[in-house]
Each structure stands twice: as C-alpha cells, then as structure tokens.
Amino acid sequence: MATLGTGMRCLKSCVFVLNIICLLCSLVLIGAGAYVEVKFSQYGDNLHKVWQAAPIAIIVVGVIILIVSFLGCCGAIKENVCMLYMYAFFLIILLIAELAAAIVAVVYKDRIDSEIDALMTGALDKPTPEITEFMDLIQSSFHCCGAKGPQDYGPNIPASCRGETTVYHEGCVPVFGAFLKRNLVIVACVAFGVCFFQLLSIVIACCLGRQIKEYENV
C-alpha cells in the first residue's frame, strides 16, 4: 500500500482527535444521565418509574458511544477501511437514536406539568405512608405545599409545608415540574452536542476510508 499523503494523514489525525472528543462526550453523556437518574430517584419510586426511561437510555447510549469511539480510534490508527466504515455505520445508528431521544425529551417536557398534577392530585386523594413520605420530601425540599397550594390539605396542613414562621403558599406542581424540565433540558442539550461531533466524525471517517481504499489500489 502506498504511503498516505499529508492530506490523508491530516484526515487520520482528525478522525483520531474527534474520537477522543466523542469519548469525552460519552463520559459527559453518561454523567448527565446518571445525575438526572439520581436526582429523579430521590423523589419516590412512583415518580422514578415514570421518568427513569430517559436518563437510563442516555446512559446506555453513552456507553455504546464509548465503545464505538474506541473502534474509530483503532480504525484510524490501523488505517483499516472496514473498521472505519463499520464505525461510521454504527455512528449513524447512534446519531438517529440520540436525536430521537433528545427530541422526545424536548417534546415530552411540555407534558410534565399535567402528569405531575395528575400524580400529586391522585396521591393526595388516596394517601399512603409511601405517598405521604414522597410529598413531605418534595414539600420540604422545594418549599411548596400540596399540588396547587396549602388549600389541598384543608385545615390539616403538614409540618413539611411550613417554614420557620410561615406556610409555603406555592403549589408543588409548577415548582417540581420546573425542576424536572431543567433536568430534561440538560440531557437534551448534552445529546445534541454529542450529535454534532458524531456527524463530523462520520463525514471525516468516510472520507478517510475512501482515500485509504484509493491508495490501496495504487
């Protein structure tokens, strides 16, 4: 095989550097997914079951990106056309999955308030020890009371709805909903950022693979 020219060595270096960036991005993705997963899981098992799918999916995608990026690094170092094309193919699959997950997170964000409202209203109508503990944790953490306000409890306002001197007047639906939205936006932004670097990697890896194939035929 002929020696790669300066331009192709530059492409090879670009693929390697972009894969290092993708490796780092995958760690950020895993970290962001884990952070959101831990945050959501702190506020009760019922809520966790509703929201756990998005952060877990992001963590899984991050791990896959880590493996695929390693494949890309090996393909660039070994100048292996098959590995480079496999790498590009897997990146395309991941890119589609990440874009779908990020779009779902952004779209689903608008349904958070209605779902939290239904969850908390139902919880207050049929309280159990677990639900009471869940509401107490939300109320004391976010300085809110009930689903829509302290009137949800009538005269029996719990201690978790009280500060040092006053009762919390804001309902927990908008406050806790805003918390969930912020965390979903974090996941979506990280996913979109990773997609940008992956798209660059796909284009450059395909260019490098084509050029290596041409040099092999010289």
UniProtKB/Swiss-Prot annotation:
Pfam families: Tetraspanin. Belongs to the tetraspanin (TM4SF) family. Keywords: Membrane, Transmembrane, Transmembrane helix. It is found in: Membrane. InterPro entries: Tetraspanin/Peripherin, Tetraspanin_animals, Tetraspanin_CS, Tetraspanin_EC2_sf. GO terms for cellular component: plasma membrane. Gene3D superfamilies: Tetraspanin. Residues 1-12, 72-82, 206-218 are cytoplasmic. Residues 37-55, 109-183 are extracellular. Disulfide bonds: none annotated. Its main location: membrane. This is 23 kDa integral membrane protein. It comes from Schistosoma haematobium (Blood fluke). The chain crosses the membrane at residues 13-36, 56-71, 83-108, 184-205.
